[in-house]
Amino acid sequence: MAKISRRDLVISLSAAAAGAFLLPKTVTASGLEKIVKKGRLKQSVSWWCYQRNFKLPEFARIVADMGLTAIDLLQPNECEVIKEFGLICSMGYAEAAKIPDGLNNKANHDAIVKGLEKGIPLAEKMRVPNLIAFFGNRRGMSDTEALDNCVTGLNRIKKMAEDHGVNICVELLNSKVDHKDYQGDRSDFGLQVVKAVASPRVKLLFDIYHVQIMEGDIIRTIRNNHQYIGHYHTGGVPGRHELDDTQELNWATVCRAIADTDFKGYVAHEFVPTRDPIKSLSEAVALCDV
């Protein structure tokens, strides 16, 4: 199966945000049983993983029928589409949020800050709790310089985030498989940045798939640092596919560990299904409903 990344799909499909694909005949929203029963964790799902399969309104209805309350990684116009289904966007994009061109380089700060200055009030208005940000690629930069630059950039915008009650979540990504040269590829680096910024509205987007590839030790890291984490992503390792018995992690145990920290944010599924997409998502939601 050809490898698909979030970046590839966002680029190739952004012109058709609402989608242009037909819902498979075997899937009907009215026939879905509510899956979320316990609800200790608020679960969401990343839209980019399903853009090849569904129109956004149809997918939103399916997600709502499952018992989820949000969809992840939407553009502002897409946030409006899902409102009628009682859903919010759990993680939004701000302008100039680019994986390689991140906060580690001061040359990017003006564009990033401008995008967040526009995006934060809009996020508050649309009830989007989080906006994504990135550390950026190294390009030869030392971690010490990058850390200082990231803190400087986030300090410019943290007050606005605090005033509007919107979280800026900077994502940890792996540099071993998917994002070569990415600077924020270790939890220690990201934690140093967030601790130095010292704002309740600047957190990590802790992508469990990426952290597992780079360092493992998922549960202990979460338990010791949960106060610095604003959002979680799931994805099976290896391959970023279903959360099943082909994967390295015991996802129910991981999710129980998250719930035990009294986490109030979202755990968003960000895996690319290889089988029936709704069946795969349903199984993941049930597994993580701890």
Per-segment meaning from a language model:
Residues 2-64, 127-129, 184-206, 210-290:
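Histidine-acidic metal/acid-base catalytic patches
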Residues 8, 13-22, 35, 101-203, ...:
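Active-site acidic/histidine proton-transfer and metal-coordination neighborhood
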Residues 44-54, 100-111:
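Active-site mouth loops of central-metabolism enzymes
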Residues 49-51, 75-77, 95-97, 137-139, ...:
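Active-site-proximal loop/turn and secondary-structure-junction residues that shape catalytic pockets
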Residues 59-78:
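Catalytic domains of carbohydrate-active enzymes, especially glycoside hydrolases
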Residues 75-85, 99-100:
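Glycine-rich, proline-tolerant flexible connector loops at the mouths of alpha/beta enzymes
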